[in-house]
């Protein structure tokens, strides 16, 4: 037996919209009435009518509702199934109503979408019910009754199109698959989509792709039936045709020559239909990038004993002392091979002769003015001083203070810091 619940808020203006909602189902559907009232009370005056499944079809023929919520029982009898069919297909006066189906979890994926606009799977949550309100409010063509209007037909207002008309892919049976779904139609919706409908769109797209794949297999099997030699009494089902094709191809490969087989293979490879998309080759790093990575790895494990091993690959800064006769604007070039070999030993005992200094090396050596316990690339970069190469190479003795001309490998006791210009740490 149907019962009505009217939710009227105070301070409602005379033109406040009205929504007539029909709740259909067993006794448990009554618990939804309070939730539905709270959700729709902010946008309109809500009138809720509760009815069981058997009386709902007759009620829909006599009254007009803006929204129908049908809660499908977890176990359906033949009588209840027939009543649900009448509700879904016997909507004479409520063809433009919003139909929401609440489907039990054990019926998930079994009930088709014909006659429904939104399908909610149990267990119900506030988020799912809020999607119904959002779906209703975002549809620009929804129509509700007002106190000063007797009906949308009399006002000449366009009736709300059923969302199932927008979707356009619902079948005509409760537990049937959709013909339009197999055709892949109705993938675009004008109204905003809930999460359930987005998943349904993805499902439809997958179904259309699967249909296309099956059509291709069917077409190829028909072609194979034609290409295979005729054998009286041969089976024509797809599996038998494929097995016969495999035997036939094996027989042909044994008879043809390798040269002809190579031509066939080349022809198949040239056909892009049977080739996968080529992967983009990975680009190798530039030589400069590799060199920088090598230098960084060497410098990260720097030690004073290996300080001069990579001078030809590293720029070092130098500052002249007041006792020097000539400034460090004069450049020094060191051959990479000889400098690296001579620098392997102890820096304080290694002697570099003047003949070792030449203009043949392509690497500029810059000297650092003070000893650094652990190499700091940032500090060296911040103290970088450009050195311009002159046209002629001055003697090595001119680069040293007067009291240190005896040799590079000897320690100066008078000026202990002078040799620190020439040994990099």
Swiss-Prot record:
The keyword Nucleus applies. Residues 201-252 form the bHLH domain. Disulfide bonds: none annotated. Its main location: nucleus. One of its GO terms (molecular function) is sequence-specific double-stranded DNA binding. Signal peptide: none annotated. GO terms for biological process: cell differentiation; oocyte differentiation; regulation of transcription by RNA polymerase II; spermatogenesis. GO terms for cellular component: chromatin; cytoplasm; nucleus. It comes from the Eukaryota. SUPFAM superfamilies: HLH, helix-loop-helix DNA-binding domain. Keywords: Cytoplasm, Developmental protein, Differentiation, DNA-binding, Nucleus, Oogenesis, Spermatogenesis, Transcription, Transcription regulation. Transcription regulator of both male and female germline differentiation. Suppresses genes involved in spermatogonial stem cells maintenance, and induces genes important for spermatogonial differentiation. Coordinates oocyte differentiation without affecting meiosis I. Forms both hetero- and homodimers with SOHLH1. This is Spermatogenesis- and oogenesis-specific basic helix-loop-helix-containing protein 2. It comes from Homo sapiens.
């Amino acid at each position: 037996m149907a019962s009505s619940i009217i939710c009227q808020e105070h301070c409602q203006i005379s033109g406040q919209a009205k929504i007539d909602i029909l709740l259909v189902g067993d006794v448990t559907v009554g618990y939804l009435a309070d939730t539905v009232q709270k959700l729709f009370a902010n946008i309109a005056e809500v009138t809720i009518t509760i009815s069981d499944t058997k009386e709902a079809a007759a009620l829909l023929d006599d009254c007009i509702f803006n929204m129908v919520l049908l809660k499908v029982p977890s176990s359906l009898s033949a009588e209840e199934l027939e009543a649900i069919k009448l509700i879904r297909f016997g909507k004479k006066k409520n063809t433009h109503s919003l139909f929401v189906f609440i489907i039990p979890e054990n019926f998930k994926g079994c009930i088709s979408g014909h006659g429904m606009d939104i399908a909610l799977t149990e267990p119900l949550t506030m988020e799912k019910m809020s999607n119904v309100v959002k779906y209703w409010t975002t549809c620009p063509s929804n129509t509700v009754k007002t106190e000063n209007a007797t009906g949308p037909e009399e006002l000449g207002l366009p009736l709300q199109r059923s969302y199932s008309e927008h979707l356009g892919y619902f079948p005509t049976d409760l537990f049937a698959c959709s013909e339009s779904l197999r055709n892949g139609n109705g993938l675009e919706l004008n109204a905003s989509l809930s999460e359930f409908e987005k998943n349904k769109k993805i499902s439809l797209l997958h179904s259309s792709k699967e249909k296309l794949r099956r059509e291709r297999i069917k077409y190829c099997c028909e072609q194979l039936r034609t290409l295979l030699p005729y054998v009286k009494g041969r089976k024509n089902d797809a599996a038998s045709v494929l097995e016969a094709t495999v035997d036939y191809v094996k027989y042909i490969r044994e008879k043809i020559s390798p040269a002809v087989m190579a031509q066939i293979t080349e022809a198949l490879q040239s056909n892009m239909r049977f080739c996968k998309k080529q992967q983009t080759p990975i680009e190798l790093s530039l030589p400069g990038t590799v060199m920088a990575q090598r230098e960084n790895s060497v410098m990260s494990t720097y030690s004073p004993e290996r300080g001069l091993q990579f001078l030809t690959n590293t720029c070092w800064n130098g500052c002249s002392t007041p006792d020097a006769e000539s400034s460090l604007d004069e450049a020094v070039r060191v051959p990479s091979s000889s400098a690296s070999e001579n620098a392997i030993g102890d820096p304080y005992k290694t002697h570099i002769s003047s003949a070792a200094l030449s203009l043949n090396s392509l690497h500029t050596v810059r000297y650092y003015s003070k000893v650094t316990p652990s190499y700091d690339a940032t500090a060296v970069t911040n103290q970088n001083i450009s050195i311009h190469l002159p046209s002629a190479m001055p003697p090595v003795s001119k680069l040293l203070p007067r009291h240190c001309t005896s040799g590079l490998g000897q320690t100066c006791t008078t000026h202990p810091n002078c040799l620190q210009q020439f040994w990099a740490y």
